[in-house]
A protein has these predicted regions:
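Short hydrophobic alpha-helical segments used for membrane anchoring or interfacial signaling
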Residues: 216-221
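Extracytoplasmic/periplasmic proteins that interact with beta-lactams or build/remodel peptidoglycan
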Residues: 1-215, 230-241
């Protein structure tokens, strides 16, 4: 059909893992369902977003983030409307999805910190890319990416952990449905990061501090490596992703 179009869609890379000095996993990736919109297939973006608010239970923060990303995203890029959809979100959208050409639910990778508060002050966390960060990042390198390191090792080693996006050339119809794949360059996962922190010593230090306010730092005097770094009160980094 003359209305079919060839487009290049970015494929975001998975983030590199973070380990302690002995190979214990401290920062992991896992798949979640997200609602995304293709700029190339939606003519009335504001109207579409307004109609999706009650269906996907969008917050004002969701709307603001989406609007910020739309301004800088490539024409062929799929932009996240909401990450980590609930079963209820998915069920409600499935009933009306044909009324939203260009909007679909897809699987994306997000971050998970298996030890919660224990390494929060060391690892930090990732979060949605904000306006200030959008102005600084390389648009090509972050095409299709929603998360970026905010504090801690996640931020300090962002360039190492991020990876390189891939691209997929597809033929799509006027509604944005992919008819066939024409070629693909796979994304490259970010590099893994091994910290000097020792899981065992970190656990002992946290138990010693218990619920008291304060901090404990253990340093190897021979090398200067930090083996444990605990601060109380702590926080659950998973709540910020």
């Amino acid at each position: 059909s003359d209305k079919n179009r060839i487009r290049l869609q970015p494929l975001p890379p998975a983030r590199g893992y973070i380990y302690d000095r002995n190979g214990i996993l401290l920062a992991d990736n896992y798949p979640v369902f997200s609602a995304t919109l293709s700029r190339a297939d939606v003519t009335d973006i504001d109207g579409t977003l307004s109609r999706l608010i009650p269906i996907l239970s969008l917050t004002q923060e969701d709307v603001d983030r989406f609007n910020s990303r739309v301004k800088t995203a490539r024409k062929t890029e799929r932009i996240a409307i909401k990450l980590n959809l609930t079963e209820n979100d998915i069920a409600k959208f499935s009933e009306v999805k044909y009324a939203f050409p260009g909007v679909k639910i897809e699987t994306q990778m997000t971050r998970y910190y298996p030890h919660g508060e224990l390494f929060a002050h060391v690892i930090g966390y990732v979060g949605r890319i904000n306006d200030r960060e959008l102005k600084k990042i390389d648009k090509d390198l972050y095409a299709g990416t929603n998360l970026i390191g905010k504090i801690g090792a996640e931020k300090s080693y962002e360039d190492l952990l991020h990876g390189t996006p891939g691209y997929e050339s597809v033929e799509a119809d006027a509604h944005g449905n992919v008819l066939r794949n024409l070629g693909r360059q796979d994304p490259v996962r970010g590099n893994d990061l091994y910290l000097s922190i020792d899981y065992g010593l970190q656990t002992i230090a946290a138990k010693q501090l218990a619920d008291r306010r304060g901090a404990i730092v253990a340093i190897d005097p021979r090398t200067g490596e930090i083996l444990a770094l605990v601060s109380s009160p702590s926080f659950n980094p998973n709540l910020f992703v």
